[in-house]
């Protein structure tokens, strides 16, 4: 469902005028979208972020790969800031890298640095675009590819045709609940009923998505 369609789903529930055609560019810069419709757009994004944080949604998962350089410890994930790491694998060996603290990484630097195949990683800063960086330990001494499987929130919806990645129902209901709360009344559905519908829709969506990753908690011996 597109951003415009999501906004209209909420507007219909509020018995407000819907947006007939796609606007151009960022919704907040549009002269064809009313101020109230823009408010609903903001509430859609608030609800989206809330639902995204409930669960490691499959549609939000992706892999970031870095290629090591001999003698270089710090690498940019080019991932943005709001991510969760699921798994880190050395493609050359199949070995899993374990997350450790910055204190541990610091303890390995003296009196001399370790070099070799990376076995550990720790977050260490970000670039000017808020992309997170990691340090590898031992410091690589050859070219290898390290895969980082992550969960990454979708950017805020701004353009009319941008499609929502996660399940739509809990996002729409969540935005509706926020809109009713924002203006204090709805003249229809009780706010308690809406809140209950929001909770139930999120639970159902999580149950369905979790069924496709039910083996993630199991361990396999190679």
Label for each model-derived stretch:
Residues 1-222:
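Glycine-enriched, solvent-exposed interface loops adjoining structured elements
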